[in-house]
Design a protein with these regions (language model features):
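Exported/periplasmic cell-wall-interacting domains
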Residues: 7, 65-68, 77-173
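Gly/Pro-biased beta-strand-loop elements
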Residues: 7-111
Length: 173
């Protein structure tokens, strides 16, 4: 007979650090995005540089919810073609998987996407002029902290997150 381990997975969520507890790094550049206040704040050597308004984010609780957590800038592209919507995303800054910070997107024929609900396919959208300024300022490897209490809400508790095995917790029975 093969015995199955008697450990129960314990749920944890993506790491979101609230503004109350966030401290920017004292050296180098950092980006802090608060998806509740819809603000993106930049820091350099621990000091505030500028604040931008976030125009759209992934809808909380949906498949496209923008994930909270601690990341780094992985890639910068002046113009990136989205694999989700086949639209151009100007001044794209990739921070995790298929998630980017970028300017207002436009179709391949050059027409901008209409302003709508304030939700995106998961990316963090800025005004294109703001995205350009951020793109020119940020470096590959810059810390990116994304905060959202939505990913921690009770409505969402069973749809997002990861499991961590806790060997001290036994399955009864």
């Amino acid at each position: 007979t093969i015995e199955t381990p008697s450990i129960l997975p314990e749920r944890i969520t993506l790491g979101s650090i609230s503004d109350e507890y966030y401290t920017p790094p004292t050296e180098g550049k950092a980006i802090r995005v608060n998806l509740e206040t819809m603000e993106l704040v930049t820091y350099e050597n621990g000091s505030h540089v500028t604040t931008y308004t976030v125009l759209a984010k992934g809808k909380p609780g949906s498949y496209y919810e923008t994930p909270g957590g601690e990341y780094k800038v992985l890639l910068k592209e002046e113009k990136h073609l989205s694999s989700v919507g086949k639209i151009w995303m100007p001044y794209s800054i990739q921070f995790f998987g298929n998630y980017f910070i970028h300017g207002w997107p436009y179709y391949q024929n050059g027409n901008e996407l209409p302003v709508g609900s304030g939700y995106s396919g998961g990316c963090i959208r800025l005004a294109t002029t703001d995205a350009q300024a951020l793109y020119e300022w940020v470096d590959k490897g810059t810390a990116v902290s994304v905060f959202s209490t939505a990913s921690l809400s009770e409505d969402n508790i069973e749809t997002r997150g990861y499991f961590l095995l806790n060997p001290k917790k036994k399955i009864s029975g």
